């Protein structure tokens, strides 16, 4: 059967297209295309965007939207209390002879303070405890490893009055 031709029952169709029909098919499509191109030229191209000029060789990632967190429940039920309150910061006032001279001479009260307290914390603690305005605080660490603070009061407050209130003099 490989060598034999099988005749089919369907008649052959002529699929060739005459030249006159070909031009008539192509002509309307070309006219439509030309019309569309003309209207596009008339309107102008609106989506033409210019490229941003890069002035740096380093690429910095753009800052993206960062929404604030909205937790379903608080992770810490109670806020931490500050351990550095005025009672922990100020350990004791100094009552040595040189400390009393500073009270009389330079309006300064000397305190032994907590090792981890800084100058602003010492100033706030003195202001809160004794209702005075602090001008400046000098600190030093003693050879014994303790911190000493020299608290100079502002001129409208007398260090002698405050020392009297504490019980130094």
From Swiss-Prot:
<keyword id="KW-0689">Ribosomal protein</keyword>
<dbReference type="Pfam" id="PF03939">
    <property type="entry name" value="Ribosomal_L23eN"/>
</dbReference>
<dbReference type="InterPro" id="IPR012677">
    <property type="entry name" value="Nucleotide-bd_a/b_plait_sf"/>
</dbReference>
<dbReference type="InterPro" id="IPR013025">
    <property type="entry name" value="Ribosomal_uL23-like"/>
</dbReference>
<dbReference type="Pfam" id="PF00276">
    <property type="entry name" value="Ribosomal_L23"/>
</dbReference>
<keyword id="KW-0699">rRNA-binding</keyword>
<dbReference type="InterPro" id="IPR012678">
    <property type="entry name" value="Ribosomal_uL23/eL15/eS24_sf"/>
</dbReference>
<comment type="function">
    <text>This protein binds to a specific region on the 26S rRNA.</text>
</comment>
<dbReference type="InterPro" id="IPR005633">
    <property type="entry name" value="Ribosomal_uL23_N"/>
</dbReference>
<keyword id="KW-0687">Ribonucleoprotein</keyword>
<comment type="similarity">
    <text>Belongs to the universal ribosomal protein uL23 family.</text>
</comment>
<dbReference type="GO" id="GO:0019843">
    <property type="term" value="F:rRNA binding"/>
</dbReference>
<feature type="region of interest" description="Disordered">
    <location>
        <begin position="1"/>
        <end position="20"/>
    </location>
</feature>
<dbReference type="InterPro" id="IPR019985">
    <property type="entry name" value="Ribosomal_uL23"/>
</dbReference>
<dbReference type="InterPro" id="IPR001014">
    <property type="entry name" value="Ribosomal_uL23_CS"/>
</dbReference>
<dbReference type="GO" id="GO:0031012">
    <property type="term" value="C:extracellular matrix"/>
</dbReference>
<protein>
    <recommendedName>
        <fullName>Large ribosomal subunit protein uL23</fullName>
    </recommendedName>
</protein>
<keyword id="KW-0694">RNA-binding</keyword>
<dbReference type="GO" id="GO:0022625">
    <property type="term" value="C:cytosolic large ribosomal subunit"/>
</dbReference>
<dbReference type="GO" id="GO:0003735">
    <property type="term" value="F:structural constituent of ribosome"/>
</dbReference>
<dbReference type="GO" id="GO:0006412">
    <property type="term" value="P:translation"/>
</dbReference>
<feature type="compositionally biased region" description="Polar residues">
    <location>
        <begin position="8"/>
        <end position="20"/>
    </location>
</feature>
């Amino acid at each position: 059967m490989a060598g034999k031709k099988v005749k089919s029952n369907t008649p052959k169709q002529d699929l060739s297209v005459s030249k006159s029909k070909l031009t008539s098919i192509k002509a309307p499509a070309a006219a439509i295309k030309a019309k569309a191109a003309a209207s596009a030229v008339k309107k102008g191209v609106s989506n033409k965007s210019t490229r941003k000029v890069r002035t740096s060789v380093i690429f910095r990632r753009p800052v993206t939207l960062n929404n604030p967190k909205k937790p379903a429940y608080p992770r810490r039920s109670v806020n931490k209390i500050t351990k550095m309150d005025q009672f922990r910061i100020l350990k004791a006032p100094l009552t040595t002879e040189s400390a009393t001279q500073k009270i009389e001479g330079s309006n300064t009260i000397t305190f032994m303070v907590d090792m981890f307290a800084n100058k602003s914390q010492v100033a706030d603690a003195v202001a809160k405890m004794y209702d005075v305005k602090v001008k400046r605080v000098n600190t030093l660490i003693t050879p014994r490893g303790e911190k000493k603070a020299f608290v100079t009061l502002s001129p409208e407050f007398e260090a002698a009055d405050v020392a009297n209130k504490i019980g130094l003099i």
